Amino acid sequence: MDTQKIEAAVKMIIEAVGEDANREGLQETPARVARMYQEIFSGLGQTAEEHLSKSFEIIDDNMVVEKDIFFHTMCEHHFLPFYGRAHIAYIPDGRVAGLSKLARTVEVYSKKPQIQERLNIEVADALMDYLGAKGAFVVIEAEHMCMSMRGVRKPGTATLTTVARGLFETDKDLRDQAYRLMGL
Protein backbone atom coordinates (compact mmCIF):
# COMPACT_ATOMS: atom_id res chain seq x y z
CA MET A 1 0.00 0.00 0.00
CA ASP A 2 1.39 3.39 -1.00
CA THR A 3 0.89 5.44 2.18
CA GLN A 4 2.72 8.47 0.76
CA LYS A 5 0.28 8.62 -2.13
CA ILE A 6 -2.66 8.29 0.27
CA GLU A 7 -1.31 11.11 2.44
CA ALA A 8 -0.88 13.39 -0.57
CA ALA A 9 -4.40 12.58 -1.80
CA VAL A 10 -5.96 13.23 1.61
CA LYS A 11 -4.16 16.56 1.86
CA MET A 12 -5.54 17.48 -1.57
CA ILE A 13 -9.06 16.54 -0.47
CA ILE A 14 -8.75 18.64 2.69
CA GLU A 15 -7.70 21.61 0.57
CA ALA A 16 -10.30 20.90 -2.13
CA VAL A 17 -13.16 21.11 0.39
CA GLY A 18 -11.88 24.52 1.46
CA GLU A 19 -10.02 23.63 4.67
CA ASP A 20 -6.50 24.55 5.70
CA ALA A 21 -4.43 21.35 5.69
CA ASN A 22 -1.93 23.05 8.00
CA ARG A 23 -4.53 23.84 10.66
CA GLU A 24 -3.64 22.21 13.99
CA GLY A 25 -6.48 19.66 13.95
CA LEU A 26 -5.78 18.65 10.35
CA GLN A 27 -1.97 18.57 10.22
CA GLU A 28 -1.70 14.87 11.06
CA THR A 29 -4.93 13.81 9.34
CA PRO A 30 -3.30 12.62 6.09
CA ALA A 31 -0.96 10.30 8.04
CA ARG A 32 -3.81 9.10 10.26
CA VAL A 33 -5.96 8.28 7.24
CA ALA A 34 -3.07 6.40 5.60
CA ARG A 35 -2.56 4.30 8.74
CA MET A 36 -6.31 3.68 8.96
CA TYR A 37 -6.43 2.50 5.34
CA GLN A 38 -3.55 0.09 6.01
CA GLU A 39 -5.66 -1.44 8.77
CA ILE A 40 -9.12 -1.46 7.22
CA PHE A 41 -7.89 -2.62 3.81
CA SER A 42 -5.56 -5.32 5.19
CA GLY A 43 -7.59 -8.02 3.41
CA LEU A 44 -6.56 -6.85 -0.06
CA GLY A 45 -4.90 -9.73 -1.89
CA GLN A 46 -5.77 -12.25 0.83
CA THR A 47 -8.07 -15.26 0.92
CA ALA A 48 -9.43 -17.32 3.80
CA GLU A 49 -7.45 -20.39 2.71
CA GLU A 50 -4.95 -20.13 5.59
CA HIS A 51 -7.82 -20.03 8.10
CA LEU A 52 -10.08 -22.71 6.63
CA SER A 53 -7.37 -25.17 5.61
CA LYS A 54 -6.72 -25.81 9.32
CA SER A 55 -9.68 -28.04 10.11
CA PHE A 56 -10.64 -30.99 12.28
CA GLU A 57 -11.93 -34.41 11.29
CA ILE A 58 -15.53 -35.15 12.20
CA ILE A 59 -17.65 -38.23 11.51
CA ASP A 60 -21.08 -36.64 11.09
CA ASP A 61 -22.40 -34.08 8.66
CA ASN A 62 -24.72 -32.06 10.90
CA MET A 63 -25.15 -28.40 10.08
CA VAL A 64 -22.80 -25.93 11.75
CA VAL A 65 -24.15 -22.40 12.31
CA GLU A 66 -22.27 -19.38 13.56
CA LYS A 67 -24.34 -16.23 13.77
CA ASP A 68 -23.99 -12.57 14.67
CA ILE A 69 -20.42 -12.22 13.40
CA PHE A 70 -19.96 -8.46 13.54
CA PHE A 71 -18.04 -6.86 10.67
CA HIS A 72 -17.37 -3.47 9.16
CA THR A 73 -16.07 -2.66 5.73
CA MET A 74 -15.95 0.16 3.21
CA CYS A 75 -18.43 0.47 0.37
CA GLU A 76 -16.44 0.59 -2.84
CA HIS A 77 -18.91 3.02 -4.42
CA HIS A 78 -18.60 5.93 -1.96
CA PHE A 79 -15.75 4.81 0.33
CA LEU A 80 -18.12 5.08 3.28
CA PRO A 81 -18.49 2.32 5.88
CA PHE A 82 -21.12 -0.34 6.01
CA TYR A 83 -21.36 -2.68 8.94
CA GLY A 84 -23.52 -5.40 10.36
CA ARG A 85 -23.66 -9.08 11.09
CA ALA A 86 -22.88 -12.16 9.07
CA HIS A 87 -24.60 -15.47 9.75
CA ILE A 88 -22.95 -18.62 8.38
CA ALA A 89 -24.26 -22.17 8.03
CA TYR A 90 -22.41 -25.03 6.42
CA ILE A 91 -22.65 -28.79 6.06
CA PRO A 92 -19.26 -30.41 6.74
CA ASP A 93 -17.84 -33.14 4.54
CA GLY A 94 -15.68 -34.88 7.12
CA ARG A 95 -13.92 -31.69 8.31
CA VAL A 96 -14.99 -28.73 10.47
CA ALA A 97 -13.29 -25.39 10.93
CA GLY A 98 -12.44 -23.98 14.32
CA LEU A 99 -15.19 -21.53 15.24
CA SER A 100 -12.86 -18.54 15.22
CA LYS A 101 -11.94 -19.41 11.64
CA LEU A 102 -15.44 -18.56 10.44
CA ALA A 103 -15.18 -15.10 11.99
CA ARG A 104 -11.70 -14.72 10.49
CA THR A 105 -13.11 -15.64 7.08
CA VAL A 106 -15.64 -12.81 7.31
CA GLU A 107 -12.86 -10.48 8.48
CA VAL A 108 -10.52 -11.29 5.59
CA TYR A 109 -13.14 -10.51 2.97
CA SER A 110 -14.48 -7.42 4.75
CA LYS A 111 -11.04 -5.77 5.00
CA LYS A 112 -11.09 -4.25 1.52
CA PRO A 113 -13.34 -2.03 -0.59
CA GLN A 114 -16.42 -4.20 -0.86
CA ILE A 115 -20.07 -4.56 -1.75
CA GLN A 116 -22.39 -6.61 0.42
CA GLU A 117 -23.39 -9.03 -2.32
CA ARG A 118 -19.77 -9.92 -3.10
CA LEU A 119 -18.96 -10.32 0.60
CA ASN A 120 -21.71 -12.98 0.78
CA ILE A 121 -20.34 -14.78 -2.26
CA GLU A 122 -16.71 -14.70 -1.13
CA VAL A 123 -17.50 -16.12 2.31
CA ALA A 124 -19.72 -18.90 0.93
CA ASP A 125 -17.26 -19.81 -1.83
CA ALA A 126 -14.39 -19.92 0.69
CA LEU A 127 -16.30 -22.49 2.77
CA MET A 128 -16.85 -24.61 -0.32
CA ASP A 129 -13.35 -24.22 -1.79
CA TYR A 130 -11.07 -24.21 1.25
CA LEU A 131 -13.06 -26.28 3.76
CA GLY A 132 -14.66 -28.60 1.22
CA ALA A 133 -18.13 -28.14 2.71
CA LYS A 134 -21.07 -30.01 1.17
CA GLY A 135 -23.05 -26.80 1.35
CA ALA A 136 -22.76 -23.22 2.55
CA PHE A 137 -25.41 -20.61 3.33
CA VAL A 138 -24.48 -17.04 4.25
CA VAL A 139 -26.84 -14.26 5.31
CA ILE A 140 -25.53 -10.75 5.82
CA GLU A 141 -27.51 -7.88 7.30
CA ALA A 142 -25.89 -4.48 7.21
CA GLU A 143 -26.44 -0.75 7.47
CA HIS A 144 -24.77 1.33 4.77
CA MET A 145 -23.55 4.81 5.63
CA CYS A 146 -23.94 5.79 1.97
CA MET A 147 -27.71 5.47 2.59
CA SER A 148 -27.68 6.86 6.14
CA MET A 149 -25.41 9.91 5.78
CA ARG A 150 -26.05 11.03 2.21
CA GLY A 151 -28.43 10.54 -0.68
CA VAL A 152 -31.70 9.12 0.61
CA ARG A 153 -30.61 9.68 4.27
CA LYS A 154 -32.45 6.77 5.86
CA PRO A 155 -30.46 5.78 8.97
CA GLY A 156 -31.23 2.40 10.46
CA THR A 157 -32.18 0.80 7.16
CA ALA A 158 -30.93 -2.79 7.03
CA THR A 159 -30.02 -4.57 3.82
CA LEU A 160 -30.17 -8.38 3.89
CA THR A 161 -28.41 -10.51 1.30
CA THR A 162 -28.12 -14.28 1.04
CA VAL A 163 -26.15 -16.79 -0.95
CA ALA A 164 -26.54 -20.57 -1.04
CA ARG A 165 -24.00 -23.08 -2.31
CA GLY A 166 -24.02 -26.87 -2.62
CA LEU A 167 -26.79 -28.66 -0.72
CA PHE A 168 -28.35 -25.36 0.35
CA GLU A 169 -28.97 -24.40 -3.29
CA THR A 170 -31.44 -27.21 -3.90
CA ASP A 171 -32.80 -28.10 -0.46
CA LYS A 172 -35.35 -25.52 0.72
CA ASP A 173 -35.91 -27.41 3.99
CA LEU A 174 -32.19 -27.16 4.75
CA ARG A 175 -32.24 -23.40 4.06
CA ASP A 176 -35.33 -23.02 6.26
CA GLN A 177 -33.58 -24.91 9.07
CA ALA A 178 -30.56 -22.60 8.72
CA TYR A 179 -32.81 -19.53 8.87
CA ARG A 180 -34.41 -20.85 12.07
CA LEU A 181 -31.04 -21.60 13.68
CA MET A 182 -29.84 -18.12 12.71
CA GLY A 183 -32.93 -16.62 14.32
CA LEU A 184 -34.07 -15.02 11.06
From Swiss-Prot:
Any one annotated GO CC term: cytoplasm
Organism: Streptococcus pneumoniae serotype 4 (strain ATCC BAA-334 / TIGR4)
Presence of the UniProt keyword Nucleotide-binding in the record: yes
Molecular function terms from GO: GTP binding; GTP cyclohydrolase I activity; zinc ion binding
Residues where Zn(2+) binds: 75, 78, 146
Protein name stated in the entry: GTP cyclohydrolase 1
PANTHER family: GTP CYCLOHYDROLASE 1, GTP CYCLOHYDROLASE I
SUBUNIT field: Toroid-shaped homodecamer, composed of two pentamers of five dimers.
Pfam families reported in the protein's UniProt record: GTP_cyclohydroI
Keyword Hydrolase: yes
